[in-house]
Amino acid sequence: MEIRMELLPGVTLTAVQTEKFKTGCFSINFFRPLRREEAAMNALIPSVLLRGSEGCPDLRSIAARLDELYGASVGSLVRKKGEVQLTGFYADFIEDTLAGEAVFAPVMDFLGELLLRPRLEDGCFVREYVESEKRNLANAIASRVNDKRTYATGQLVKTMCAGEAYAVPRLGELEDVEPVTPEGLYAQYRMVLAESRVELFYMGRKSAGDVAEQLQRVLRELPRAAAFEAVGTEKQCAARDVRRVEERMDVTQGKLSMGFTTGCTAGEADYPALLVLNTVFGGGITSKLFTKVREELSLCYYAMSSIEKNKGVMIVSSGVEFDKLETAEEEILRQLEDCRNGEISDYEFESAKNYLLSDLKTALDSPGRLDDYAIGQRAAGLEGGMEDLARGIEAVTRGQVAEAARRVMLDTIFTLRGTEG
């Protein structure tokens, strides 16, 4: 059973008590508006905090402490949900009943120490740690170009949402990493602690009351401002001509990424129909893009669609031979037009709904997915759970899917070609 409660001003806990698992999970998430001027710094903060605290000043002592806690794991979190950047920690730990002694409480104490009592040097973060994590972050950002599918999608989003917060990458931009100083990063950290909304997620055998009591004690030193910075996502709307962008690189396979506006975001009445549409169109192995564009016509090495539920955007990603790019684009649009006209077979329709319902059922048995879903809902200002979404999907009709398709409008096309020809 899921219970939500406010523990401190601007700090809310979602607790799911269950005995399904041998381990519990917990995450702490600081909600920030996705802005280029702070995105890279926000991405750095959790990694720097995990380098050392007052009691465990280096990685070796942190690892030793986690070993003492029956091999508990702690990691950094950097997520992008619409136009909200979420940073913080997650932890997995064995249940007290299986360990035969308290594990949850000392794990929470240790997380509190890592978060609130970092190792400092001259009143700010340790320079060695900051510079090391800057290199790691810069390498992670620079490596995006190595995955051409991800790169093409990123370039599409930058064009489609130019001038909007959504265009900012999850980890920030490469050129914003090098100027970060220990002093500036520490000041940003203090601001994030005080001025951000905080969402906590727990899943395990403890009652919500026990979890709340422990966390209120651990977070009693968390600074809280008089007001917290608002976060949210502006829905993408279509009212312009289709934009085209092309790049050339030394690649052997072309990439075709197409961005559409959906006119619908999570929480709206039509959202379940949009989910079914996405699955019919390109969201699975029974979809039109897979069975027809890829399998029957052999136009793509892969072709799939996905939606950003908080932004109102659908993206089609495909890998295509250079000489088939135009034909593939035409066929992808033709399949969407078939959806608009209600040309959806019984098999496509039922398979899509069954796939979505099965996926939601599987997610209910995955602490990580439940955490990600719950936090994504909070970032969108929504409260409903997966069970509510499943009921909505069950009620979707074929006519509603066609209507959802008619609201989907092509906005931007990004093409990646080779350097020759």
Regions found by a protein language model. Give the residues of each.
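Glycine-rich, mobile lid/loop segments that gate access to catalytic sites or pores
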Residues: 137, 143-145, 160
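Short, flexible, solvent-exposed loop/turn segments with mixed acidic/basic and small polar residues
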Residues: 78-81, 186-193, 304-307, 402-406
